[in-house]
């Protein structure tokens, strides 16, 4: 297929048109008075969203060059969402403002490479200043404030997330699911839960709830299949003498071994239950080791020279209780030593920092949560499916923003932190580098300007008032239309969100500004079918018979 090559200002202007169209669609969602965007779906009902990245992902432009520009900024929104969980609209608005201002200067003759260098230096200085302006999240109230702002000023969602974080801790896992009713709920699972249920319903102790409930059980951990009960007999005899229940966690328990355990359970010889070990392969071994550390036991592993026959009661873990249903096993208050659990937690945190795979990171974080806190499930309820999706998006955003705030701290919100950081930096740059730095500094007004515009206020007046305010915590509350102390009013943003949004915006804008040529496919119009209306139908061919 033939390709079209376009150079210099013409190429950059085309790319800018695409960026502008994407920005125009995304920017309307910004701030407490931002509007919704209605998105047509290829099937089913249209979706309504106020989530910047959801809007950006749907933008596909007809012109291939414009679409290239839009797709680069769309990538910025997605990357910002992946890294910080929020700030996608801020990143898009900043990228557009930097590109627009930079394009004007480069068209006027500035050197793109020097301009880029100045932009990078300004970005670095502002990020450093943002970190200085930040402070730690102090209490549950501030967590609720961050979540409320990110959830489009929905206090109920903010409080729900604050409750969840208080219960499972900052390392705990908080998941968001759709509720069966119209009400929002918070369910917290204390202790370690993994997704394996009982191997036989005959183990059930609570027929009403269809669960196995073991009080102060011993826990045997084995990393292979158990097919022969003979290997288990020595440890079973020791358990029987104590009169305590036993939970067996192994790769699998099959045939004769499982049947004999069930018979012993039904006859009342042993209060016993068995489940499969969670995970697969190396992850299964790691999770068994986690359970061993949590319960103060040891994994009986043939790789370490241990056989099931050699297991003693000292190798078994303990917990205050274990609850098993058909899908999940929950171990509450494992008897492991705190020092060993802390060491394991730190080891998993180090692995999270080193891994480059998103999937591995997610699985490691799940393991970390199960060891350190617990799991909270926020169930989001709504009257219609469309509202449910929109609300779930907001809860996901708020949850990510809250985690970012706990991780790196908070700054004043509403776009004011970027303006305050700009006022504090002093750069000694010359020529086109100074122009590059000035481009970034001017663009930092764009988020506040957009928030004010969406709320129906004069953006120039608002930006000027915030820039000239004597108190560095003063910003603009767009919901009320007042200048307030942002910290006292609870209008706060995670510094990570601001930092990541700025870094990604500068990165993509500088790439676009240093583009000198574009290569795109020439779309060829497919020939239309010839008009056959004049042939008079098949009847006119009768003479050929």
Curated annotation (Swiss-Prot):
Statement: the UniProt record of this protein carries the keyword Nucleotide-binding: yes
MF GO annotations: ATP binding; ATP-dependent protein folding chaperone; isomerase activity; unfolded protein binding
One GO CC term, this protein: cytoplasm
EC code(s) of this entry: 5.6.1.7
Reactions catalysed: ATP + H2O + a folded polypeptide = ADP + phosphate + an unfolded polypeptide
Gene3D superfamilies: GroEL, GroEL-like equatorial domain, TCP-1-like chaperonin intermediate domain
Pfam families to which the protein is assigned, alphabetical: Cpn60_TCP1 (PF00118)
Primary localization class, coarse: cytoplasm
Keywords: ATP-binding, Chaperone, Cytoplasm, Isomerase, Nucleotide-binding
Biological process annotations from GO: protein refolding
Residues annotated for ATP binding in this entry: 29-32, 50, 86-90, 414, 477-479, 493
Described function: Together with its co-chaperonin GroES, plays an essential role in assisting protein folding. The GroEL-GroES system forms a nano-cage that allows encapsulation of the non-native substrate proteins and provides a physical environment optimized to promote and accelerate protein folding.
Subunit structure: Forms a cylinder of 14 subunits composed of two heptameric rings stacked back-to-back. Interacts with the co-chaperonin GroES.
PANTHER family in UniProt: 60 KDA HEAT SHOCK PROTEIN, MITOCHONDRIAL
Similarity-based family: Belongs to the chaperonin (HSP60) family.
Name of the molecule in the record: Chaperonin GroEL
Gene this protein is translated from: groEL
């Amino acid at each position: 297929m033939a390709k079209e090559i376009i150079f210099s200002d013409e190429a950059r202007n085309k790319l800018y048109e695409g960026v502008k169209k994407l920005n125009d669609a995304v920017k309307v969602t910004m701030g407490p008075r931002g509007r919704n965007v209605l998105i047509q779906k290829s099937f089913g009902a249209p979706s309504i969203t106020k989530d910047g990245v959801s809007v950006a992902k749907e933008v596909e432009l007809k012109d291939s060059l414009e679409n290239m520009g839009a797709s680069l900024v769309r990538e910025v929104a997605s990357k910002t969402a992946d890294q910080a969980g929020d700030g996608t609209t801020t990143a898009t608005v900043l990228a557009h403002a930097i590109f627009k201002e930079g394009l004007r200067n480069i068209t006027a003759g500035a050197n793109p490479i020097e301009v880029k260098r100045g932009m990078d230096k300004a970005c670095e200085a502002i990020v450093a200043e943002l970190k200085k302006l930040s402070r730690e999240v102090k209490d549950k109230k501030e967590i609720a404030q961050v979540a409320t702002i990110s959830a489009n000023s929905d206090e109920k969602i903010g409080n729900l997330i604050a409750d969840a974080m208080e219960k499972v801790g900052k390392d705990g896992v908080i998941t968001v699911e759709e509720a069966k009713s119209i009400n929002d709920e918070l369910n917290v699972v204390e202790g370690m839960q993994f997704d394996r249920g009982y191997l036989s319903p005959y183990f059930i102790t609570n027929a009403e709830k269809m669960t196995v409930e073991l009080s102060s059980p011993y826990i045997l951990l084995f990393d292979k299949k158990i097919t022969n009960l003979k290997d288990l007999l020595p440890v079973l005899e020791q358990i029987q003498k104590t009169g305590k229940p036993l939970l067996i966690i192994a790769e699998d328990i099959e045939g004769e071994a499982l049947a004999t355990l069930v018979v012993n359970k039904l006859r009342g010889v042993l209060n016993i239950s068995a489940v499969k070990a969670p995970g697969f392969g190396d992850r299964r071994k790691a999770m068994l080791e986690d359970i061993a550390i949590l319960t103060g036991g040891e994994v009986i592993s043939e790789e370490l020279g241990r056989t099931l026959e050699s297991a003693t009661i000292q190798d078994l873990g303990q917990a205050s209780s274990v609850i098993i249903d058909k899908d999940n096993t929950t171990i509450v208050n494992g008897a492991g030593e705190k020092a060993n659990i802390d060491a394991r937690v730190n080891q998993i945190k180090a692995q999270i920092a080193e891994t480059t795979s998103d999937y591995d990171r997610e699985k490691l974080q799940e393991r970390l949560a199960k060891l350190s806190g617990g799991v909270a499930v926020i169930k989001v309820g709504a009257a219609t499916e469309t509202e449910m999706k929109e609300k779930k998006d907001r809860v996901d955003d708020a949850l990510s923003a809250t985690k970012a705030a706990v991780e790196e701290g908070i700054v004043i919100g509403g776009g004011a932190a970027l303006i305050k950081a700009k006022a504090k930096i002093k750069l000694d740059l010359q020529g086109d580098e100074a122009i590059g730095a000035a481009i970034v500094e001017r663009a930092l007004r764009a988020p506040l300007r957009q928030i004010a515009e969406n709320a129906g206020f004069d953006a120039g007046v608002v930006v000027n008032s915030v820039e000239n305010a004597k108190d560095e915590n003063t910003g603009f509350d767009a919901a009320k239309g007042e200048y307030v102390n942002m910290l006292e009013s609870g209008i706060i943003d995670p510094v990570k969100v601001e930092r990541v949004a700025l870094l990604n915006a500068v990165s993509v804008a500088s790439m676009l500004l240093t583009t000198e040529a574009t290569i795109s496919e020439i779309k060829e119009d497919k020939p239309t079918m010839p008009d056959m209306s004049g042939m008079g139908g098949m009847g006119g061919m009768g003479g050929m018979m």
